[in-house]
Amino acid sequence: MGLEAQRLPGAEEAPVRVALRVRPLLPKELLHGHQSCLQVEPGLGRVTLGRDRHFGFHVVLAEDAGQEAVYQACVQPLLEAFFEGFNATVFAYGQTGSGKTYTMGEASVASLLEDEQGIVPRAMAEAFKLIDENDLLDCLVHVSYLEVYKEEFRDLLEVGTASRDIQLREDERGNVVLCGVKEVDVEGLDEVLSLLEMGNAARHTGATHLNHLSSRSHTVFTVTLEQRGRAPSRLPRPAPGQLLVSKFHFVDLAGSERVLKTGSTGERLKESIQINSSLLALGNVISALGDPQRRGSHIPYRDSKITRILKDSLGGNAKTVMIACVSPSSSDFDETLNTLNYASRAQNIRNRATVNWRPEAERPPEETASGARGPPRHRSETRIIHRGRRAPGPATASAAAAMRLGAECARYRACTDAAYSLLRELQAEPGLPGAAARKVRDWLCAVEGERSALSSASGPDSGIESASVEDQAAQGAGGRKEDEGAQQLLTLQNQVARLEEENRDFLAALEDAMEQYKLQSDRLREQQEEMVELRLRLELVRPGWGGPRLLNGLPPGSFVPRPHTAPLGGAHAHVLGMVPPACLPGDEVGSEQRGEQVTNGREAGAELLTEVNRLGSGSSAASEEEEEEEEPPRRTLHLRRNRISNCSQRAGARPGSLPERKGPELCLEELDAAIPGSRAVGGSKARVQARQVPPATASEWRLAQAQQKIRELAINIRMKEELIGELVRTGKAAQALNRQHSQRIRELEQEAEQVRAELSEGQRQLRELEGKELQDAGERSRLQEFRRRVAAAQSQVQVLKEKKQATERLVSLSAQSEKRLQELERNVQLMRQQQGQLQRRLREETEQKRRLEAEMSKRQHRVKELELKHEQQQKILKIKTEEIAAFQRKRRSGSNGSVVSLEQQQKIEEQKKWLDQEMEKVLQQRRALEELGEELHKREAILAKKEALMQEKTGLESKRLRSSQALNEDIVRVSSRLEHLEKELSEKSGQLRQGSAQSQQQIRGEIDSLRQEKDSLLKQRLEIDGKLRQGSLLSPEEERTLFQLDEAIEALDAAIEYKNEAITCRQRVLRASASLLSQCEMNLMAKLSYLSSSETRALLCKYFDKVVTLREEQHQQQIAFSELEMQLEEQQRLVYWLEVALERQRLEMDRQLTLQQKEHEQNMQLLLQQSRDHLGEGLADSRRQYEARIQALEKELGRYMWINQELKQKLGGVNAVGHSRGGEKRSLCSEGRQAPGNEDELHLAPELLWLSPLTEGAPRTREETRDLVHAPLPLTWKRSSLCGEEQGSPEELRQREAAEPLVGRVLPVGEAGLPWNFGPLSKPRRELRRASPGMIDVRKNPL
């Protein structure tokens, strides 16, 4: 919509094509017995509403039409026109809950099965497939996603965009233009589906009474295709400088709503008002365009924003298809009629469709940059839906075949090029075996032979190593051009013929494989349908046919929801047991097929149900064994989602719960089949087909899930590898920059040291100047100049420190890049491991699927045998049903023919009361028996608990006994030891009396040690005696436990005694009541035998009506329970879809993060390059500064030489004056000695003249100033006076030696006033003349 198309004069009239799609009845509608009010005739394109309202449309799709049929009938022609340059629009119209969003495919974006994919995913997959097949096309595809909510625009791809920033305008050609909407360039189906899911997450949805996930806004998904370059023959060829631009709009309108039905309040009510007003405006536009009498009148496009967006689609420049979705339920009769009326009017709308061209110059520069980037990745990585293509027409068959062959040739040549390069590398390997090397050499020779044969055929379709453009021009020159062209044509025709032959072989093999696969799939589907039908009949046999089995009979595909509007940072959803929508047998929006209502006896299906459930449990067990090999959390979630374990449990529980019956006995439960009105509340014609999840379907779903996961991981791995490459390049750039920065850091450190030295010297001089008393204004000005320069030096030091810190931060980038590179490599390795696991799992699933198919073929024989048995049982059941019907007719005739008197009625009522009392006695007897059984169970539990406590107590008592025995043993041991010590003490005492003094000392020590040991043993014996007297043989915790056990056992004994008394009492009462019941039963039979036939029939009718009432109440409860289970199933499905959306968002977040990191690395590379360039510029600037400084020094040197020359001339003049004063040398010398000051002044004056400008020049470094001040005068200055006379004059030498100390004394005085840093001196132009080396040499050596 943001593109401007130029309309050509030759416009094609294209009427709006209308397709009608009828959705199946919803499970809730089937549950409440809603009737279908539509009769569909798809072959005639006609539908009848009610009895006498007939409508005809271009396409009519019945309830059993799949998504593929909708796409082929409605969208496939539009896609072809889209590639031919026409604008196309497809929009869904209908009431809320009629299946519009499901048809468009926005609700099933995350679905893994092909049958659930809607229009948008299929169209985008087909578009990218066509682009991939046509390599000669240069295409650019970009998409946008817009929402109209409460008459305000919202960009679903850029949620932060304000509504006021999106404006709808018209250009000078009348085209509708949307400004401010984000358009994203896409290269594959995965990107489109990711954008759709992202937009659906931001779309407004909500719950109403009619639809739990109702669209609360209109959405427009726009795909723009730009084609340039050479186009295939079946497509228009763009003119030079022209661009073929076409737009495809997928519009999902919100459904019309009735407030009373939807129960909308508050915000939902406001949304409903806005939706109905915009749909009313759209209906007015359709009515105005579709009414032949109103042609040329005003069309109210501006009444709503959605009508302004659809201006080109309705009556404008586009080919449009309208899909009207209706509900067949009789409760939606009025809404269905309204939709059919509008759809019928829309067939009269005529559009003027043209091919849209745009000048190439109008292409925005950003698109040019994006189009000039590298070749895009192949779209085969995306989730392209594999399906059969429609057979092309005879007019385009040859062109399409030629196009396909050209694409095949290009692909074969590319593969040959790659194989040639790889085999050349392989041939260079030393370890290649001889046979393999020979085969490789033969293949390379064959390829080179073909290359030499086709060496003249260069261009985009040539063979390996085709000639360049210059070679083509050289080969095509002269008279050989026609011969070579003919030879090339012949060679290419032969090659095309060979490739066609190979292609035909491949296609034949592919068709055989596809045919075999279709046969196997059809056979498997038939087997599954037969099993499902048998399950249906078995479920309908049982009396309690509602409730869970009814819910299982409703195809869960009807609950497929759209992704719900949810906060982006919501909590994690709870994992509930549910069936994933991908493995459900539902076809489309609430696709449930109606089964026949069969009346069977319970004994007729018990054996069949047992066998079928046994088979189902076997497959479930096999699936469970395979899943047990995985991790426990994943296995648990998988089993919950597929409900394999639940099916197995039900299969094992049902056969045991069925009582065995030997004969076809008639019971009250079987009378339900003949009771009118006992099946449903709203009607007796509700038909439900019970369907179970076949193991093969679950296996296919797991296969598709694993394949999708592998594809997504492959894309993430590729993106991570690209990011790793960017990180490697960034690391190399950072290393190069680190080397430069290291050098720069060293230079900055040297410069900083120099600046610090200058700063310290300047501060020192400044302190010296401040310490002295300033005499004049010049010194004060110099002091201020020093202070200013010190401050400048300090700021320069600070700047250098900051530069050093910034440089160090840049140096640390390399280490960070290395760390991130290692982390990304670990992530890629982990992803590869996951990919390997998924591939192994994929192989296992494939093997399991093969085993299941083999097992299904074996089960088929058993199913046929069961069918024969079932037919026999059906005959028996039919006989019983006829008997029941005859009995009812007889009962009705008897009740109508007899007149019951009032006394008989009272008697019947008394008998009924008496029977009710007897029934109550029986019920009381049963309740008493149940209570007795409960008491017995409780007593058993108490006895078991007492047994456990007794065992624990026995253990503690045995432990106490063992402790007591151990203590007794300790006492015996201690006593024996004491006796032994007593004997030793008596012996030692005798030795002590008889021994010597030395031995007595030793014996006393031994006696002391023995007495100490005796005392300790006595204490130990006392402690043991105390324990035995106190009975503390166990630890305090064990003693407390033993005490508690005694108390608990005592309490249990009391409880057991009480239970025994209660049981005895109940048994006594039951024995008495049993005798009474036996007597009552005899009396009951006697009284019933005395009743007349009319009284018996009347009494039976009373009880029959009571049973019917009870059955009605039970059925109402079952319906309520089924509704609750359906709500639970919907919530579980919502949780599943949210989990899928969350997983997709995680992958998308990972991809976006990878892209951002890649962009960041590219920005870092640019920053490093700029930093490197800036650093080079800085080095160049410093080099230029040094060169300028050298030039300034050379200029100063020239100036000093000029001053030197002037001083020589003055000195020569002074010497000449001295010679002319007299001829006596002694007097001249004495005068020179007497008046040295004048001569010094004459000698020093010019020197002071050239020293004074130094104080006024630009600042210099302290070292330069010190060198200039303290450097000795050049030797040429000392020799300059000898140019005109003898050099050995001692008088003149003494004069010069006398003058030199004066110069030494004068210079230090000026040193204090000299600045510590000099700059270039300002001199006249004539002084800037640089002296040549020859002149300098002449001046130094004048002789």
From Swiss-Prot:
PTM description: Polyubiquitinated by UBR3.
Gene Ontology cellular-component terms listed: ciliary basal body; ciliary tip; cilium; cytoplasm; cytosol; fibrillar center; intracellular membrane-bounded organelle; kinesin complex
Tissue specificity note: Embryonic stem cells, melanotic melanoma and Jurkat T-cells. Expressed in heart, lung, liver, kidney, testis, retina, placenta, pancreas, colon, small intestin, prostate and thymus.
Intracellular or extracellular location(s): Cell projection, Cilium; Cytoplasm, Cytoskeleton, Cilium basal body
Mutagenesis or variant effect for R154Q: In ACLS; uncertain significance; atypical phenotype
A GO molecular-function descriptor: ATP hydrolysis activity
Residue positions where Phosphoserine is found in the record: S898
Alphabetic keyword roster: ATP-binding, Bardet-Biedl syndrome, Cell projection, Ciliopathy, Cilium, Coiled coil, Cytoplasm, Cytoskeleton, Disease variant, Intellectual disability, Joubert syndrome, Motor protein, Nucleotide-binding, Obesity, Phosphoprotein, Repressor, Ubl conjugation
SUPFAM superfamilies: P-loop containing nucleoside triphosphate hydrolases (SSF52540)
Effect of mutating L759P: Found in a patient with Bardet-Biedl syndrome; uncertain significance; hypomorphic variant in vitro
Interaction with DLG5 as annotated region, ranges: 358-479
Pfam families membership: Kinesin (PF00225)
Region Disordered, annotated ranges: 356-382, 451-483, 611-639, 1219-1238, 1310-1343
Coiled-coil ranges from the UniProt annotation: 480-542, 698-1057, 1109-1211
Annotated stretches, region: Interaction with SMO: 358-1206
Start and end residues of each Kinesin motor domain: 15-349
Main location: other
Family stated for the protein in its record: Belongs to the TRAFAC class myosin-kinesin ATPase superfamily. Kinesin family. KIF27 subfamily.
Disease linkage: Ciliary dysfunction leads to a broad spectrum of disorders, collectively termed ciliopathies. The ciliopathy range of diseases includes Meckel-Gruber syndrome, Bardet-Biedl syndrome, Joubert syndrome, and hydrolethalus syndrome among others. Single-locus allelism is insufficient to explain the variable penetrance and expressivity of such disorders, leading to the suggestion that variations across multiple sites of the ciliary proteome influence the clinical outcome.
Quaternary context: Can form homodimers and interacts with microtubules. Interacts with GLI1, GLI2, GLI3, SMO and SUFU. Interacts with NPHP1. Interacts with SMO and DLG5 (via PDZ4 or guanylate kinase-like domain).
Protein role: Essential for hedgehog signaling regulation: acts both as a negative and positive regulator of sonic hedgehog (Shh) and Indian hedgehog (Ihh) pathways, acting downstream of SMO, through both SUFU-dependent and -independent mechanisms. Involved in the regulation of microtubular dynamics. Required for proper organization of the ciliary tip and control of ciliary localization of SUFU-GLI2 complexes. Required for localization of GLI3 to cilia in response to Shh.
Name listed for the protein in its UniProt record: Kinesin-like protein KIF7
Organism: Homo sapiens
Gene name tied to this protein: KIF7
